[in-house]
């Protein structure tokens, strides 16, 4: 357990939830004892509760919990991982450490027993959980001895009686917070990808008529998870799992061994296992798969129909209809568990009474860290539990022991083979993982289940006949509206007579139809975002501003008095640069003040004296407590604070030098803190596994941005086993300083781009990273390898070739040569980029910008061409770069869209609301419709308004209570009139009040430090790279001029060129 890291904040939060549940159920105390690990049952509630509270399983450990106390009894080795829980809240958490001394351990249990009997005679425990081991034996011995003593006494007032804690644990773990839901969502995605993998393998086996048993196919599916890259082999896996930034396949494991059934023997219980009988490729194949991620379970099951009969199809269609009825009408907040089952039975009796006796004994169960919560089953017996918003349910329904006799009699071929006999009995099963919300439920295992998607026909004659039957059946099933629309379309396409007299009227009609279609798509996209928001968040994600507590810095000038420099004996002001300390003479003694305690200062002269005033940080000293800034002191009634001190001296120059030294020391301290924060997310990559000799693929004569050194030096880009290496070529053999290396691992590449040199001056390969790396002294999310596309041209006026050319033949030849050279460069770089993608074994996909879809905009300081790709919106030519991942976008908002303006702004809001929004300003209004069409095509919801919005305040409001934000309609407010920046600024200015409590000079320079130390949370580029490189590459680009200056230059250039 060397890498155990327990989240203290999460522990206190979940402990509080469990304590409230104990109080609600009138259980005064609870004892959870875990002995030796057992592989027979991994879902014991005692172990599940440990995982929920601590994130890990602690064997040979007891946890005693009351409404005010939590006591751990464990070994010394495990106590090291729990010690920080007692340090932060010693009144709440206690740690009793066991040793090798048997008597000491016995006294701990006796002390625990006395504590329990003193509080109450009743205590809660998980009655079903049975553990073995020395730890359990010692506790049972103490408990039995106490019971024997109580039985011998005439009064038995102190005898402990145990009540079952299973329901209490289930209630505490039922509602999932956002982190738990994210883990469940990843687990659901993994189950969907594994089901898709099974379908591909199953189809190959059935089509090729391979001989394999159900259990053998189960083992094949189960073994796939051993390879951490298994999900990269399918497109669905790349979309659902690879796109998740923090996904780690190491945390994936099976909830149960996959269940595959075929050939007429079916068991719809969750305890079923795959049999050793052959996989029969006719009739029905059932597959159930459940994966869990970080211990959070998911479940999915599908029925696959192979050459089905009409009765099979009819019964399966009803199963789909039944699931839709349950999801739409029964899986809602507040519905009792038994009502879900009873209403389902009533619906079957009404619609298909012949199937009632074949229906499963329940409709599913509560899902979480425990795969199947036995206290919350959706059946007729569970009368005391209700569905609640935030719960995750495994909805499992099906029909078993169905007979297929009637359709077999109608078959043309009366000779029944063995396979046809197996088709006599079949079963249907459908399982999905669903989240309960206030309104409609959220489907987490979104995998195809329509009959057309799960039906397979390997008989050509039957397939042809069935297609004809389907076509005949579909025509009468069309609604009147569909028929009318079809007739209208046919009439429009087959006639040459125009309905309007003018061409532009037809164009306007087409535009109107396109706009209407786009609006319909947008309505669906907005509804989808709303449902996703309700699924992602719960009431537990709300944060109260009153709960904010400042973060206090830990610093120390000197541990011992002897460390103070000897030079302070002259009782002057000294600056200790090494320990970042100001030493002031007070009452004849040197008193150290760390530079972090210094706030601001001022220097002025009055008569013959020079006054130096130093202001120090202290709680409530005119600071803005709403800002999450780090404060150097902790406010406590036991602490005394020096707010300011004034020192007078006749030596003016000495005071000037001291004041300057203090200011410089403070600036250096602020700069170090800022650099430390910027480098907080920089990772140390794993080692590059190098290839040797001819196996190394190389691209010579390339340059890198950002450059490791100040000089621009060419180098070679190499492909190795697990990443790329750029190595610069030294200008001379003795100059080893210029031999710079930059390694980029495939696992850290989020996007790989190749941009050709058409209409550009460079051809490039660009790597956008998941986590930043250091190149030289810079932190960067973007690494680019490029080569200039055009060489310097020379005018050969006096050359011998000149006399053979006439007119502009030399210029034409140069242009042809340049086009040829660019084509060769594009081919070389594209081929190498494809090699990179192939060498990554599916970890990286190559993406190429679509220049024809590009639009001009200002993402940072200058106008550039922003170009869409398959997965992103990029600008890769001029730093700072822009890389916006489309999959991460929550909504796109168009600002300043109003009549009379020549341009508009585009704002991207990310699904991770902690990321700053990305602005692309000054887009020409002529491209408005093109931008809207592109955003709609990539499934991004759009909103628009006439004003610029204050996104800092909007995102703070959303983060305060995201669940309530989506309950209130989510992003629907963006379609209305937003407040302008000027209105927001006027509101902020109106809140200003002059304070007379503190002197004027106190905040003058602290504001200067604050401007360096603090930056607006939403005013910069995206720190994780979704918004581009940001300020990492500022040194590579010149600051842009304002628009007035550019217009004056353009007008001057027009006059000089002779244009009016």
Swiss-Prot record:
Bias kind Polar residues: ranges: 478-490
Localization: Nucleus; Chromosome
Main location: nucleus
Cross-referenced InterPro entries: Creatin/AminoP/Spt16_N, Creatinase/aminopeptidase-like, FACT-SPT16_Nlobe, Fact-SPT16_PH, FACT_SPT16_M, Pept_M24, PH-like_dom_sf, RTT106/SPT16-like_middle_dom
Skewed-composition ranges (Acidic residues): 979-990, 997-1044
Family matches, as Gene3D superfamilies: 2.30.29.150, Creatinase/methionine aminopeptidase superfamily (3.90.230.10), Creatinase/prolidase N-terminal domain (3.40.350.10), FACT complex subunit Spt16p/Cdc68p (2.30.29.210), Pleckstrin-homology domain (PH domain)/Phosphotyrosine-binding domain (PTB) (2.30.29.30)
Organism of this sequence: Candida albicans (strain SC5314 / ATCC MYA-2876) (Yeast)
Family to which the UniProt record says this protein belongs: Belongs to the peptidase M24 family. SPT16 subfamily.
Biased composition (Basic and acidic residues): 1045-1060
An individual GO BP term: constitutive heterochromatin formation
Self-association and partners: Forms a stable heterodimer with POB3. The SPT16-POB3 dimer weakly associates with multiple molecules of NHP6 to form the FACT complex.
Protein name per Swiss-Prot or TrEMBL: FACT complex subunit SPT16
């Amino acid at each position: 357990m060397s890498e155990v890291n327990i989240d203290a904040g999460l522990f206190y939060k979940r402990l509080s939830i469990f304590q409230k549940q104990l109080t609600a159920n009138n259980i005064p105390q609870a004892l959870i004892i875990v002995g030796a690990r057992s592989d027979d049952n991994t879902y014991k509630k005692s172990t599940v509760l440990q995982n929920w509270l601590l994130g890990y399983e602690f064997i040979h450990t007891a946890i005693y919990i009351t409404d005010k106390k939590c006591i751990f009894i464990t070994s010394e080795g495990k106590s090291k991982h729990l010690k920080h829980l007692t340090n932060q809240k010693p009144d709440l958490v206690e740690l009793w450490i066991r040793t090798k001394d048997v008597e000491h351990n016995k006294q701990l249990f006796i002390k625990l027993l006395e504590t329990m009997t003193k509080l109450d005679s009743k205590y809660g425990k998980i009655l079903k959980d049975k553990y073995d081991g020395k730890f359990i034996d010692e506790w049972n011995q103490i408990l039995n001895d106490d019971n024997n003593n109580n039985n011998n006494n005439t009064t038995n007032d102190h005898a402990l009686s145990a009540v079952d804690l299973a329901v209490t644990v289930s209630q505490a773990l039922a509602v999932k917070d956002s982190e738990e839901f994210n883990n469940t969502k990843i687990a659901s995605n993994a189950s969907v990808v594994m089901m898709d993998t099974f379908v591909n393998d199953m189809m190959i086996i059935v089509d090729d008529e391979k001989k394999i048993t159900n259990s053998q196919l189960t083992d094949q599916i189960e073994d796939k998870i051993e390879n951490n890259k298994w999900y990269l082999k399918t497109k669905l896996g790349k979309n659902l799992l690879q796109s998740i930034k923090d996904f780690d396949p190491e945390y994936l494991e099976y909830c149960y061994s996959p269940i595959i059934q075929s050939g007429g023997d079916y068991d719809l219980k969750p305890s079923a296992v795959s049999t050793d009988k052959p996989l029969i490729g006719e009739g029905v194949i059932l597959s159930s798969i459940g994966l869990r991620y970080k211990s959070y379970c998911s479940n999915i099951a599908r029925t696959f129909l192979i050459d089905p009969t009409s009765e099979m199809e009819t019964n399966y269609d009803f199963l789909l209809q039944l699931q839709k009825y349950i999801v739409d009408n029964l899986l809602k907040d507040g519905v009792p568990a038994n009502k879900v089952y009873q209403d389902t039975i009533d619906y079957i009796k009404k619609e298909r009474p012949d199937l009632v006796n074949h229906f499963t004994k329940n409709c599913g169960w509560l899902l979480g860290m425990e795969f199947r919560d036995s206290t919350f089953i959706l059946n007729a017996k569970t009368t005391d539990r209700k569905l609640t918003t935030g719960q995750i349910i495994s909805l499992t329904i099906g029909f078993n022991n169905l007979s297929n006799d009637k359709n077999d009699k109608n078959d043309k071929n009366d000779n029944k083979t063995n396979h046809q006999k197996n088709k006599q009995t079949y079963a249907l099963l459908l399982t999905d993982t669903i989240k309960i919300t206030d309104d409609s439920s959220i489907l987490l295992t979104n995998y195809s289940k329509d009959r057309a998607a799960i039906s397979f026909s390997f008989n050509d004659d039957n397939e042809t006949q069935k297609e004809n039957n389907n076509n005949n059946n579909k025509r009468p099933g069309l609604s009147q509206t569909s028929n009318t629309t079809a007739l209208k379309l046919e009439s429009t396409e087959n006639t040459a007579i125009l309905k309007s007299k003018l061409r532009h009227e037809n164009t306007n009609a087409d535009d109107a139809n396109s706009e209407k279609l786009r609006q319909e798509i947008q309505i669906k996209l907005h509804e989808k975002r709303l449902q996703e928001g309700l699924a992602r968040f719960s009431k537990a994600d709300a944060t109260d501003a009153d709960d904010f507590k400042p973060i206090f810095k830990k610093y120390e000038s000197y541990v011992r008095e002897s460390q103070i420099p000897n030079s302070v004996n002259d009782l002057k002001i000294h600056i200790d640069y090494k320990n970042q300390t100001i030493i002031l003479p007070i009452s004849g003694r040197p008193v150290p003040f760390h530079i972090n305690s210094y706030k601001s200062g001022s220097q002025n002269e009055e008569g013959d004296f020079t006054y130096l005033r130093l202001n120090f940080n202290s709680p409530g000293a005119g600071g803005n407590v709403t800002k999450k800034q780090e404060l150097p002191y902790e406010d406590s009634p036991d602490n005394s604070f020096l707010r300011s001190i004034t020192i007078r001296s006749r030596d003016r120059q000495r005071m000037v030098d001291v004041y300057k030294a203090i200011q410089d020391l403070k600036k250096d301290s602020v700069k170090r803190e800022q650099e430390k924060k910027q480098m907080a997310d920089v990772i140390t990559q794993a080692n590059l596994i190098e290839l040797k000799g001819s196996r190394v693929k190389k691209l010579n004569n390339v340059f890198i941005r950002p450059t490791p050194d100040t000089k621009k030096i060419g180098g070679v880009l190499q492909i190795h086993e697990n990443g790329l290496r750029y190595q610069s070529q030294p200008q001379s053999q003795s100059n080893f300083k210029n031999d710079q290396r930059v390694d980029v691992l495939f696992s850290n590449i989020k996007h790989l781009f190749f941009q050709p040199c058409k209409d550009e001056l460079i051809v490039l390969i660009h790597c956008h990273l998941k986590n930043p790396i250091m190149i030289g002294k810079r932190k960067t999310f973007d690494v680019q390898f490029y080569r200039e596309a055009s060489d310097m041209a020379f005018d050969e006026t006096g050359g011998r070739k000149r006399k053979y050319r006439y007119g502009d033949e030399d210029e034409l030849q140069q242009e042809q040569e340049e086009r040829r050279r660019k084509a060769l460069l594009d081919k070389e770089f594209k081929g190498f980029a494809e090699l990179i993608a192939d060498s990554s074994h599916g970890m990286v996909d190559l993406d190429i910008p679509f220049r024809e879809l590009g639009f001009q905009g200002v993402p940072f300081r200058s106008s550039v061409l922003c170009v869409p790709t398959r997965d992103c919106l990029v600008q890769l030519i001029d730093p700072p770069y822009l890389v916006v991942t489309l999959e991460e976008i929550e909504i796109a908002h168009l600002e300043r869209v109003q009549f009379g303006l020549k341009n508009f702004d585009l704002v991207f809001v990310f699904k991770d609301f902690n990321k700053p929004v990305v602005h692309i300003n000054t887009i020409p209004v002529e491209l408005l419709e093109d931008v809207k069409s592109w955003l709609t095509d990539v499934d991004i919801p759009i909103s628009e308004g006439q004003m610029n919005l204050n996104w800092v305040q909007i995102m703070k409001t959303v983060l305060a209570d995201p669940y309530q934000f989506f309950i209130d309609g989510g992003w629907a407010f963006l379609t209305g009139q937003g407040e302008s920046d000027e209105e927001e600024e006027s509101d902020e200015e109106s809140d200003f009040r002059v304070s007379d409590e503190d002197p004027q000079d106190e905040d003058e320079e602290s504001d200067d430090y604050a401007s360096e130390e603090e930056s607006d949370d939403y005013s910069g580029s995206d720190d994780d790279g979704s918004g581009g490189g940001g300020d990492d590459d500022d040194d590579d680009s010149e600051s842009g001029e304002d628009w007035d200056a550019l217009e004056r230059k353009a007008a001057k250039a027009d006059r000089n060129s002779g244009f009016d």
